Amino acid sequence: MTQKAKNTIYLLILIILSMLCLVYASVPLYSIFCKVTGYGGTVRTATATQSKLGKTTIKIRFNADINKELPWKFYPEIPYTTVKPGEQKLIFYRAENLTNEYVSGMAVYNVTPYKVGKYFNKVACFCFTKQTLSPYQKTIMPVSFFIDPNIETDPETSDVKLITLSYTFFKYKENTK
């Protein structure tokens, strides 16, 4: 085999390995990108609210879905609320385990329209950790959030009057690796 053929084979192997590494790293990298930028309706987390209050009022609608593998009831206590940007709100979802076994679930979330994700900040949320309910247990799950007042000055979001905060609960499966 000529040296040129060997170099071509080495290059192809290097390209394939690079592509495999990129595929393996793409999910966590995309997740980090979405959390940092708010892309795709990904909500940001915060430790405190803004000190300035906005002038407009925005209606927040709450949505709750459950994957068919999770035997729970899950719903918001109220269907919507209103909030001024910068104002911290505390709302509650309710969950109930419908079985006679311990069941764990994990919630994923987003907001729509997607363009407001970078302005929607969660201070506390049940979605940050796995939730385990004992047999037939009913529980209340709090969510504390605020909307960054800069939403009012961004030309892409200044006209937003309705935001939907949506959760989907999935059955938590322990990693068996």
UniProtKB/Swiss-Prot annotation:
It is a single-pass type II membrane protein. One of its GO terms (biological process) is respiratory chain complex IV assembly. The chain crosses the membrane at residues 9-29. The keyword Magnesium does not apply. GO terms for molecular function: copper ion binding. The keyword Transmembrane helix applies. Signal peptide: none annotated. Gene3D superfamilies: Ctag/Cox11 (2.60.370.10). Exerts its effect at some terminal stage of cytochrome c oxidase synthesis, probably by being involved in the insertion of the copper B into subunit I. Belongs to the COX11/CtaG family. PANTHER family: CYTOCHROME C OXIDASE ASSEMBLY PROTEIN COX11, MITOCHONDRIAL-RELATED (PTHR21320:SF3), CYTOCHROME C OXIDASE ASSEMBLY PROTEIN COX11-RELATED (PTHR21320). This is Cytochrome c oxidase assembly protein CtaG. It comes from Ehrlichia ruminantium (strain Welgevonden). The gene is ctaG.
